[in-house]
Amino acid sequence: PQGRPVMFLHGGPGAGCSPAHRRLFDPERYNILLFDQRGCGRSTPSADIEHNTTWDLVADIERLRTEVLHADRMAVFGGSWGSTLALAYAETHPDRVRALIVRGIFLLRQAELRWFYQEGASWLFPDLWEDYLAPIPEAERDDLMAAYRRRLTGDDPQAQLQAAHAWTQWESHTISLLPNPAHHRAHAAAQAALAFARIENHSFVNRGF
């Protein structure tokens, strides 16, 4: 607790933190806070998308800084979606950021989302793309994120889980060029897959609010 305060912001949104994330920091030097963002990881209620926007999360970070870390300033570390959130926090509260570390930078641009979820990455992983398309009828494939949203937020639990697993497996298998079983297992459980897919899709369809 006497170390330099640092807050770790995970990816997704919806991925949650893992014990491995602690290994990024020397516990002899840093007071480390791993923050499971709203609706995912150990946060409750799970898979909840109400009051779950970028700016709700920025407010959560600021509250954790004051009420948990008790720090005037802190380092903020984020990768992928975590980099988006870290940048949003740093722009909103620049005087509270001692250091900003971002990797795998993702800026939530329309071109990035379209490349990964509509057309682009599909050319690199054609076999996995077929699995991603499977829950969506051809008539709805002109806007895949919107089609997934209808299923992830619909009233049919079976359709929700089918969509959640397809969305999650697409991302976990394509997040690196070489297979990584740890990524594949991270959201294999039904509730973890639903939380990840619903929250991520919710954010992306709404362009991060």
Feature names for model-found ranges:
Residues 55-74:
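Conserved acidic catalytic loop of the alpha/beta-hydrolase fold
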Residues 95-148:
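A catalytic-pocket lid/entrance helix-loop region that shapes and gates access to the active site
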Residues 164-209:
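Alpha/beta-hydrolase fold catalytic core
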Residues 76-78, 103:
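Short beta-strand immediately N-terminal to the catalytic nucleophile in serine-hydrolase-like folds
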Residues 39, 78, 82:
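Conserved G/P- and acidic residue-centered "switch" motifs that form tight phosphate/ATP-binding loops
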Residues 2-45:
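Conserved HGGG/HGGXW glycine-rich cap/lid loop of the alpha/beta-hydrolase fold
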Residues 137-178:
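An accessory alpha-helical subdomain
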Residues 83-94, 100:
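Short glycine-enriched nucleophile-adjacent loop
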